[in-house]
């Protein structure tokens, strides 16, 4: 997908990134807001999960591990989901790095977004009160020769089985319960997501300790 293929409003909105200006001993320094938050070990996933977004988030995770391999990373998710392979790249990187990754759902975590939410550090997976979570089985289309369609259908079934196993690992539900829940689009409130094991706590305030401003 190119920029031309995307919704013009989405492109316009994503280009409006606030800048933060800080005073230092060497003068003023300006950062875009996401770079400034990255300094505080905060990563954002907003919008669909596709390859470019996945690469950026994986790079941020690896960078923060290189800076401090034990300090927690906060991963905020507001996503309708997207490409399975791109989402699994983020998930695998979250599990690969040594840093604990806390996840926070703001707005929505649907499809692959919900898997990333559930894949956070156990005990540190949160959702805001009005967040929505949606889980379902992977979908896809196939075209070409009958043998090619058969191969693609078999691949989707393999992916579905793997996703079910990941959800089972992180929720504590049985495989049968996972399969039943993911059979169709299942929309969950924050409390329902907690009961199902996708998150650990519904929060109204930032669960992380803050450092008082010395000024």
Curated annotation (Swiss-Prot):
GO terms for molecular function: ATP-dependent peptidase activity; ATPase binding; serine-type endopeptidase activity. CDD domains: S14_ClpP_2. SUPFAM superfamilies: ClpP/crotonase. GO terms for cellular component: cytoplasm; endopeptidase Clp complex. GO terms for biological process: protein quality control for misfolded or incompletely synthesized proteins. It comes from the Bacteria. Keywords: Cytoplasm, Hydrolase, Protease, Serine protease. Its EC number is 3.4.21.92. It is an enzyme of class 3 (hydrolase). It is found in: Cytoplasm. It holds the Pfam family CLP_protease. PROSITE patterns: CLP_PROTEASE_HIS, CLP_PROTEASE_SER. NCBIfam families: PRK00277.1, PRK12553.1. Cleaves peptides in various proteins in a process that requires ATP hydrolysis. Has a chymotrypsin-like activity. Plays a major role in the degradation of misfolded proteins. PANTHER family: ATP-DEPENDENT CLP PROTEASE PROTEOLYTIC SUBUNIT, ATP-DEPENDENT CLP PROTEASE PROTEOLYTIC SUBUNIT, MITOCHONDRIAL. HAMAP family: ClpP. This is ATP-dependent Clp protease proteolytic subunit 1. It comes from Gluconobacter oxydans (strain 621H).
């Amino acid at each position: 997908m190119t920029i031309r293929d995307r919704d013009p409003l989405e492109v316009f909105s994503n280009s409006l990134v606030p800048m933060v200006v800080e005073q230092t001993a060497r003068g003023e320094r300006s950062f875009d807001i996401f770079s400034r938050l990255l300094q505080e070990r905060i990563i954002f996933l907003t919008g669909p999960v596709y390859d470019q977004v996945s690469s950026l988030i994986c790079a941020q995770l690896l960078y923060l591990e290189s800076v401090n391999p034990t300090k927690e990373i906060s991963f905020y998710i507001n996503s309708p989901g997207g490409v399975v392979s791109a989402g699994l790249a983020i998930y695998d990187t979250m599990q690969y790095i040594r840093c604990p990754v806390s996840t926070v759902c703001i707005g929505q975590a649907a499809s692959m977004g919900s898997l990333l939410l559930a894949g956070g550090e156990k005990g540190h997976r949160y959702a805001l009160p009005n967040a929505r979570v949606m889980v379902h089985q992977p979908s896809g289309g196939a075209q070409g020769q009958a043998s090619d369609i058969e191969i693609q259908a078999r691949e989707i079934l393999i992916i579905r089985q793997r996703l079910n196993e990941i959800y089972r690992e992180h929720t504590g539900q049985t495989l049968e319960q996972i399969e039943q829940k993911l059979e169709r689009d299942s929309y969950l409130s924050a409390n329902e997501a907690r009961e199902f094991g996708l998150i650990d706590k519904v929060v109204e305030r930032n669960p992380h300790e803050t450092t008082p401003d010395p000024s």
